[in-house]
Regions:
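Acetyl-CoA-dependent GNAT
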Residues: 35-94, 105-106, 165-166
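Acidic/histidine-enriched, glycine/proline-rich intrinsically disordered or flexible terminal extensions
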Residues: 168-175
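Conserved acetyl-CoA-binding loop-helix of GNAT-fold acetyltransferases
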Residues: 91, 97-110, 129, 133-137
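Conserved GNAT-fold acetyl-CoA-binding loop/helix
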Residues: 18, 22-45
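A short beta-loop-alpha structural element at the N-terminal edge
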Residues: 3-17
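Conserved GNAT acetyl-CoA-binding A-motif
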Residues: 112-124
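Conserved catalytic-core motifs of GNAT/GCN5-like acyltransferases
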Residues: 74, 79, 121-124, 136, ...
Length: 175
């Protein structure tokens, strides 16, 4: 499948990202959310990514259709976590199983290294075996499970954490 990696923008990609988010909210446990998001949510989401200097990486088809995207953001708000980020990857339902999630995640890892981060963390629903397998193939280690922290579709949901340690930054500093 021919595709290209792109830096997503609000103007070009917000509607497609919103569709992918809302499908995940309404049909899966990939997002522990109940209500579909709005365009206003996307304005705030893109603004937060821009203010934090966080990438929003997409995969487009030759025709310009957004097939997958991913991003990362702060793992926790306190300053000592400045070298740690939490990422997410979403693939449009029509394009799953084609390796696009891997392409996005590899791009996020490269961006984290370029930005001198030290660890990238994924919080994954424990039943999402495809995402877990992808993370394990790329060297992420299972570092913990939080049992029954979510409730959706009439079921308690377990959340697993996968972490990849990077060799960057070379000279970390306090403060």
């Amino acid at each position: 499948m021919e595709h290209r990696v792109v830096e997503c923008t609000f103007e070009r990609h917000a509607a497609s990202i919103l569709d992918i988010f809302n499908d995940a909210i309404l049909t899966s446990t990939a997002l522990y959310d109940y209500k579909p998001r709005s365009t206003e949510n996307m304005v705030a989401w893109f603004q937060a990514k821009a203010e934090g200097g966080f990438p929003v990486i997409g995969i487009e088809s030759e025709a310009g259709v957004l097939m997958a995207f991913g991003s990362y953001g702060s793992f926790r708000a306190w300053p000592a976590y400045k070298y740690s980020v939490e990422h997410s990857v979403y693939v449009h339902k029509a394009y799953r199983g084609k390796g696009l999630g891997r392409v996005v995640l590899e791009q996020l890892i490269a961006a984290a290294q370029k930005n001198d981060l030290h660890t990238i963390i994924g919080a994954i629903d424990a039943t999402n075996t495809a995402s877990i397998a992808l993370h394990e193939r790329l060297g992420f280690m299972h570092v913990g499970t939080l049992p029954q922290v979510g409730f959706k579709f009439g079921n308690w949901l377990d959340l697993v954490f996968y972490q990849l340690l990077l060799s960057t930054p070379r000279d970390p500093v306090d403060g």
